[in-house]
Amino acid sequence: MCGIVGIVGNQPVSERLVEALKRLEYRGYDSAGVATIDAGTLQRRRAEGKLVNLESRLREEPLAGTIGIAHTRWATHGAPTERNAHPHFTEGVAVVHNGIIENFAELKDELAAGGAEFQTETDTEVVAHLLAKYRRDGLGRREAMHAMLKRVKGAYALAVLFEDDPSTIMAARNGPPLAIGHGSGEMFLGSDAIALAPFTNEITYLIDGDWAVIGKTGVHIFDFDGNVVERPRQISTAAAFLVDKGNHRHFMEKEIYEQPEVIAHALGHYVNFIENRVVPISDAIDFGKVPSLAISACGTAYLAGLIGKYWFERYARLPVEIDVASEFRYREIPLSPQSAALFISQSGETADTLASLRYCKEHGLKIGAVVNARESTIARESDAVFPILAGPEIGVASTKAFTCQLAVLAALAVGAGKARGTISGEEEQALVKSLAEMPRIMGQVLNSIQPKIESLSRELSKCHDVLYLGRGTSFPLAMEGALKLKEISYIHAEGYAAGELKHGPIALIDENMPVIVIAPHDRFFDKTVSNMQEVAARGGRIILITDEKGAAASKLDTMHTIVLPEVDEIIAPMIFSLPVQLLAYHTAVFMGTDVDQPRNLAKSVTVE
């Protein structure tokens, strides 16, 4: 969500702060701002909209200073306006914040009763006023910071400047991540190591409850009670270069076409293609002995987990409990400490997923992380890390991370089946051969279907509602298709299990309703054809995504049929993801939306 950066050193910082913010654009934002201290005075520039607007403002009114903080805001309290953009100022205090101050209304009333005048609608402004109040009461800067942290409740990553201290940035973390970068004669602060990669690869991650005093030559870190603590330094592998679009119009398009390559890379970490076998999974989690598995995630990662559930239950005969992370820990699930739990998150910082992880950890479960960011909080707090190795994914709507999550889950399920003795050596070899074929088939599909997809997408762009249907692993894929379409084209779409059509959604079917049916010719195909006949009988416009055998067997008059190669069931979800992603992408292009940064969405959701 919001992005935070800070620099304290001997060189001008404003341009470097904006460059660092560009590396956080993938998180999503609606306004931005920078504050520096120059000649003993706090100064700031803010702008609504994209960073180019802030850059334009800085060209007109440059900011000097060798210390500063900057922020990209994703609105939670108050409209996305320049007035509500961070940094917030009051009485010589500047604050930027990622998170939600849950008791801000109570604090605001208290501060207003004491004479504080609020200029914005945000929850963050109470932090600045609290700090100013404690300074007026005679507390020093560190004491004021500690006192403020004792009062605020909720999730926060904070960076603070005091006008009377032009050599120090203060920071605090409770929930959203913060990384401190160590330089030569200068220090850095960022929401993640990616923002700091051009400046340093030596990183210290704050943990929940930590707060820090950062100077030019070092940092002092304290826990919530004010005790001095040490946090380890580590070398970050985050790339120092900004990823570009290459010859593609959008990052999302580029990332769709990268899938054959990144999936081949990911699978190479989990399977031995020469011997056609899976490599040993994990020493930390014994999949051969766990009685059950819990999976929790959000959004697209949750839908990957739903598909993974089918695989673990089918190939490993392992019972799987799965729920969206925002609900998982509220259900009081009877969890066995002998069991294991997998948490799926591209960023590794998803707040609800992290909270569910900690819930399972408290109950004694072994924890596995399926993440793209190996230095993330979820990875660091897990017993075993299963990297998806998708590389940087900039588009807010997940594409290559989704299919890499699926590839890793498929390999883990086969490995679990081998460990549990539920698949034979011959079955293992056959499944691995199918996985090995996947990158080639994906490349073949991507090179052949675009003209048909573009034609169909032009028609979809004129629709107001779209229904997706699927059975088996195609059911979560139908939900993913609907999610992708509404995320980036803003067309209302819903994904349903095909067997649920008669239990409500069929009431929506008419001649204006496109129904996208994902139906490889598998053991569910005949039943799905029956559902398509029900749609056709009511004038619905069927778009069938199937394989050669399915196209021949359906015998239906469809609006469009997209024909894919026949593949093994274990790789079908990844292959059938491709037309689903391209349909959403090209429809959004025809709609003229911001494909890479759709409205109201954030790449990394770091608050609950």
Swiss-Prot record:
GO terms for cellular component: cytosol. The lineage of its organism: Bacteria, Pseudomonadati, Pseudomonadota, Alphaproteobacteria, Hyphomicrobiales. Homodimer. Catalyzes the first step in hexosamine metabolism, converting fructose-6P into glucosamine-6P using glutamine as a nitrogen source. It is found in: Cytoplasm. Its main location: cytoplasm. Keywords: Aminotransferase, Cytoplasm, Glutamine amidotransferase, Repeat, Transferase. Gene3D superfamilies: Glucose-6-phosphate isomerase like protein, domain 1, Glutamine Phosphoribosylpyrophosphate, subunit 1, domain 1. It catalyses: D-fructose 6-phosphate + L-glutamine = D-glucosamine 6-phosphate + L-glutamate. GO terms for biological process: carbohydrate metabolic process; fructose 6-phosphate metabolic process; protein N-linked glycosylation; UDP-N-acetylglucosamine metabolic process. InterPro entries: GATase_2_dom (IPR017932), GFAT (IPR005855), GFAT_N (IPR047084), GlmS/AgaS_SIS (IPR035466), GlmS/FrlB_SIS (IPR035490), Ntn_hydrolases_N (IPR029055), SIS_dom (IPR001347), SIS_dom_sf (IPR046348). It is an enzyme of class 2 (transferase). Its EC number is 2.6.1.16. SUPFAM superfamilies: N-terminal nucleophile aminohydrolases (Ntn hydrolases) (SSF56235), SIS domain (SSF53697). It comes from Rhizobium meliloti (strain 1021). The active site is at residues 2, 603. It holds the Pfam family SIS. GO terms for molecular function: carbohydrate derivative binding; glutamine-fructose-6-phosphate transaminase (isomerizing) activity. This is Glutamine--fructose-6-phosphate aminotransferase [isomerizing]. PANTHER family: GLUCOSAMINE--FRUCTOSE-6-PHOSPHATE AMINOTRANSFERASE, ISOMERIZING (PTHR10937), GLUTAMINE--FRUCTOSE-6-PHOSPHATE TRANSAMINASE (ISOMERIZING) (PTHR10937:SF0). Residues 2-217 form the Glutamine amidotransferase type-2 domain. Residues 281-422, 456-598 form the SIS domain.
